[in-house]
Amino acid sequence: MSYAVIVTGGKQYKVAEGEFLKIEKLEVATGESVTFDRVLLVANGEEVTIGAPVVAGAKVVAEVVSQGRHDKVRIIKFRRRKHHMKRMGHRQWFTEIKITGIQA
């Protein structure tokens, strides 16, 4: 089984071919292809290549499946004994991708 570790949106993801993944929002239309050049690690069965900091010439190709928003995260701030409460919420945008290829 081959897999890779990529960096996008300030986070690291372990990906394998055929996987679906929700990442931070990318400004790419649905159905288009996107390439990730920042590959930290590539593993093909027995052989593992670790970059310093990235693997030279390695890329991961993915197809954008959809764009959307995560479930709402609710935040409550309050001051004790002051009868004051503030309720807020946040929904983060995401891009869902399907990994179509790992090239090392």
Swiss-Prot record:
Record InterPro entries: bL21-like, bL21-like_sf, Ribosomal_bL21, Ribosomal_bL21_CS
Task: Recall the GO molecular function terms of this protein's record.
Answer: rRNA binding; structural constituent of ribosome
For this UniProt entry, which residues form the secretion signal? none
Q: Which domain of life is it from?
A: Bacteria
Instruction: Give the CC-aspect GO terms.
Output: cytoplasm; ribonucleoprotein complex; ribosome
Gene Ontology BP annotations: translation
Keyword terms, alphabetized: Ribonucleoprotein, Ribosomal protein, RNA-binding, rRNA-binding
Q: What does this protein do?
A: This protein binds to 23S rRNA in the presence of protein L20.
Q: Which HAMAP family match?
A: Ribosomal_bL21 (MF_01363)
Under the subunit heading, UniProt states: Part of the 50S ribosomal subunit. Contacts protein L20.
**Family as reported in the entry's similarity comment:** Belongs to the bacterial ribosomal protein bL21 family.
Q: Protein name, please?
A: Large ribosomal subunit protein bL21
